Amino acid sequence: MSLTNGVAPSLEKLAAEQKSRKKWLLVQPKSQTSMMVDSGAVSMPLNLIMVATLASKYFDVTFLDERTGDTIPQDFSGYDVVAITSRTLNAKNAYRIGDRAKAQGKIVLIGGVHPTMLTDEASLHCTSVIYGEIESVWEELAIDIFRGKMKSVYKASNLKPMTTMTPPDFSFALNSPHAKKYSQLIPILATKGCPVGCSFCTTPTVYGKSFRYREIDLVLDEMRAHQERLGKKKVRFSFMDDNISFRPKYFMELLEGMAKLGVRWNANISMNFLQKPEVAELAGRSGCELMSIGFESLNPDILKSMNKGSNRLQNYEAVVSNLHKHKIAIQGYFIFGFDDDSEKSFQATYDFIMQNRIEFPVFSLLTPFPGTPYFEEMKDRVRHFDWDKYDTYHYMFEPKKLGGEKLLENFIKLQREVYKGSAIMKRMQGKPLNWVWFVNFLMNRFTRKLTPEMYL
């Protein structure tokens, strides 16, 4: 870090003046949902790892992930700062931890998607809310912690370019006594932000409306570092980007570089980009094992109401064919609970999944997330504001055409039909024996136990 620019000299000077290093506790809370969330292998929390990477230069850091079995202490006397990351699903738990630490006189920081979207609510449970990404407010925040003069909200006036992004230090997660609970897929980030601004999405608020990206060489260097650490080429990566293909030229150049490394990877990709056969060819050649695709609905009226122009129903089968041709599995997302949904929506979805042999279908109920335009539109119809149930699996409001009872009846029936043994064999026959098979049989067991009451 340069000692001649902006606030950095003050930060370095303050750090040098400290007689001892302040102690930080970083917390990843678990959720309280009854559904299959935060169970089994969980992804390493990249955002919290980034906080640890930044903070460890000036402070002593303890890293706890409650999802893996780490215990959050009742007594915070050993720490000066307690920093908690939160999304809507674990917000109540994050608030409980924050309240406890705040009552003990600690500096409490709460950041993440939910506190960014509902800053006033989150501010009741902490000293300071980190609005959006911490990287863009880090110097200001660290200086204030040294001085002991905190602001109620830290919000960047300008987001930093990703060219200055510090590579994440995964040792904070990997050195945990419960590290075996983490998925073998290593989270990686190449881009941030999205200018599209869909009414149901939080990305533009959290990461900005401009599309930012890291230099390709830096992304590849991070992959090489993991290959060296693990002593093998076929390291598996999961891109955390919301819209990595927004700039096709950048994405294609990144894949060309990855093809030379021999890695394996998966990502969320926009539907319209996958219509091009050359994209699937390069994705397969660069080691793509699975694409996560938001099909959302087989109802054209619903797609139109979502303003999701990237989804063209007439191209769905071509997209699937392109990926399957290059042995890329599909994690397909389907949402139910729209006002225009009918029983025909479920049948059309079942037919599409079975005919196109979608390897890993994921079904959710329409959930208006707080802070989004869609939430404001639906607020008067939402059944409750119990954040523990905002997991996209609980019934949030009654759709006009179908009604709540029929919605849940058909939702459960569809899951059972898609994940019954014979359906799994039809969809998966001849495909590689890997974790996708395992997940299908886990879902077979899970869906047999479903009842409407679980979704209320």
Swiss-Prot record:
It comes from the Bacteria. InterPro entries: Bacteriochlorophyll_C12_MT, Elp3/MiaA/NifB-like_rSAM, Methyltransferase_Class_B, rSAM, rSAM_horseshoe, Tetrapyrrole_Bchl_Biosynth_MTs. GO terms for cellular component: cytosol. Pfam families: Radical_SAM. It catalyses: 8-ethyl-12-methyl-3-vinylbacteriochlorophyllide d + S-adenosyl-L-methionine = 8,12-diethyl-3-vinylbacteriochlorophyllide d + S-adenosyl-L-homocysteine + H(+). It is an enzyme of class 2 (transferase). Binds 1 [4Fe-4S] cluster. The cluster is coordinated with 3 cysteines and an exchangeable S-adenosyl-L-methionine. Its main location: cytoplasm. It is found in: Cytoplasm. Keywords: 4Fe-4S, Bacteriochlorophyll biosynthesis, Chlorophyll biosynthesis, Cytoplasm, Iron, Iron-sulfur, Metal-binding, Methyltransferase, S-adenosyl-L-methionine, Transferase. Coiled coil: none annotated. GO terms for biological process: light-independent bacteriochlorophyll biosynthetic process; methylation. SMART domains: Elp3. Its EC number is 2.1.1.331. The keyword Transport does not apply. SUPFAM superfamilies: Radical SAM enzymes. The keyword Cytoplasm applies. [4Fe-4S] cluster binds at C194, C198, C201. Residues 178-405 form the Radical SAM core domain. GO terms for molecular function: 4 iron, 4 sulfur cluster binding; metal ion binding; methyltransferase activity. Its cofactor is [4Fe-4S] cluster. Pathway: Porphyrin-containing compound metabolism; bacteriochlorophyll biosynthesis (light-independent). Involved in the biosynthesis of the major light-harvesting pigment bacteriochlorophyll c (BChlc), which confers a significant competitive advantage to green sulfur bacteria living at limiting red and near-infrared light intensities. Belongs to the radical SAM superfamily. This is Bacteriochlorophyllide d C-12(1)-methyltransferase. It comes from Chlorobaculum tepidum (strain ATCC 49652 / DSM 12025 / NBRC 103806 / TLS).
